[in-house]
Amino acid sequence: SDVYKRQIVSNPVDIMTYVFTKISGLPENQILGSGTMLDSARLRCGLSEHLNIAQKNIHAYVFGEHGDTSFIPWSGAYVSGVSLDEYYETVEKMGKNVTKIDKDAMLEYVRTSGGQVIANKGATFYAVSVAVCKLVATILSSSDSVATVSSMMHGEYGIEEVCLSTLTLVGPKGVQGKIPMRMTQEE
């Protein structure tokens, strides 16, 4: 790409992305934080293990601030194009016994996975490196991709002037914009 993009990966990533956006003088589309990319990957991994289905069939995301205040918009979680509830019903009719997910426990798993890696290995730099490489590949490619990166909010979901992770279209031109997802009022 002909325009250099900045990726923020240092924690607290959302605050660091916000500060860099404000002080750098660069266009906002050139700045993004790793946000909840890893959290979303951990969510898909946990769902894959629980449902015993390949991760590539799972579309589920972690939104908000990376860390303890992140949340999972369950109304937007899908397995091969159907909601989780529809998936349970469908596989049950096939004779498969799939236990419904404890949503609070899954969120706790997502939030604590990084800490468990640090306790076991001393750091989480490998997973962050993979996320950075995926973003670099997207930016250097000729097509856009959707990721839960941290970038400035401009009225999406009624939120202004803060960097948070939501579905974001990213590509060779950097951050193209947020992809709105319907959520319940509770979410």
PLM regions with names:
Residues 2-4:
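Short, small-residue-biased leader/transition segments that mark boundaries at the very start
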Residues 24-30, 40-185:
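C-terminal substrate-binding/catalytic lobe of Rossmann-fold NAD(P)-dependent dehydrogenases
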Residues 16-24:
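Short Gly/Thr/Asp-enriched flexible loops that form oxyanion-binding sites at enzyme active sites
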